[in-house]
Amino acid sequence: MYSKLQYISQGSTPEEQFYNINSTLDAGCKWIQLRFKNCEKKQLINLTEKIKKLCSLYNSTLIINDNVDIAKIVDIHGVHLGLKDMPVRTAREILGEDKIIGGTANTLIDVLTRINEGCNYIGIGPYRFTTTKEKLSPVLGLDGINRIMNTLTIEQRNVPVYAIGGIKHGDIDDILKTGVYGVAISGLITLSNNKKETIEILNSLLYETSTTI
């Protein structure tokens, strides 16, 4: 099963992206989502190749946001698709059955659609307002996530659901009680002055409080 903690990268340049991902891996994170919008394709391929080597050294999983073609070219573990990105079935045809395909969801209908499409995991949110992402979907909060999770059947819950969007340490316990499997975090880790301590605390909360699917 996947790590319960996914880091979504930040950085306005390839150098910043590399630094943030490298330091996050060094601090103990085992799952990276490379998210770098508005980057020239050659530059992004080059960066992805470098990050792939890093993740291999740290025995960590690497997926990329949106760019199915680059996931295929560089042969990384998979891709995360937003609601307006390439259809999951098309991505599956390109990448194959052995690759991870995650999908964003903001409503119960989104979640059920993602399950039916064959996503390997679902990122549900935003939990709260965040400046990390432009054109933010309506904020769900704890109540919104709880309502969605309570509607899912046991079989539907076999697809891991990750909460995303402005999550802090103090949110983890309540989030996991909804039945969510893990969390995807960006700003909390990126802006941390002590990434190792931040990730250790997150992993402690995630693995001591949650149940394994």
Task: Give the ranges of each region predicted by the language model.
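Active-site beta-loop-alpha junctions enriched in small/polar residues
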Residues: I8-S12, K37, N67, K84, ...
